């Protein structure tokens, strides 16, 4: 198997996976951040459309406040406050003023060899440099 197949097999609890198969893989880390139209909408839709009000495994979820820093408008600060409040309610770590999340996530140890990482930002693929599938 390729490295990607090995990571996805482990994340799906299977001995092996092959190209073209449908699998259900559990990410090691889900990364999100304070970007209007994404994080705020995600939180709202998860609750309203799917009845999900609690992160299943807070140890696998991380939030970064790394956009619009410092907040230049009240609406930006409101988004930051809502992101902090949601993170506290969920019991997930919220990192801010440390740098860009998809870079800092590696520095903080969220990216490691063999990890399966999910994020809605395409830049997360750079975590492949650490041996992760992102």
Feature roles, as predicted:
Residues 1-134:
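Fe-S-dependent hydro-lyases/dehydratases of central metabolism
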């Amino acid at each position: 198997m390729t490295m990607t197949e090995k990571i996805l097999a482990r994340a799906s609890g299977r001995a092996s996976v092959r190209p073209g198969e449908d699998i259900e893989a559990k990410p090691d880390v889900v990364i999100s951040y304070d970007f209007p139209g994404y994080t705020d909408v995600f939180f709202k839709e998860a609750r309203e459309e799917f009845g999900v009000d609690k992160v299943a495994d807070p140890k696998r979820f991380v939030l970064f406040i790394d956009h619009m820093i410092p907040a230049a408008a009240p609406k930006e600060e409101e988004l930051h406050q809502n992101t902090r409040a949601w993170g506290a309610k969920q019991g997930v770590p919220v990192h801010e003023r440390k740098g860009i999340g998809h870079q800092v996530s590696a520095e903080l140890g969220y990216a490691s060899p063999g990890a399966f990482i999910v994020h809605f930002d395409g830049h997360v693929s750079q975590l492949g440099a650490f041996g992760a599938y992102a």
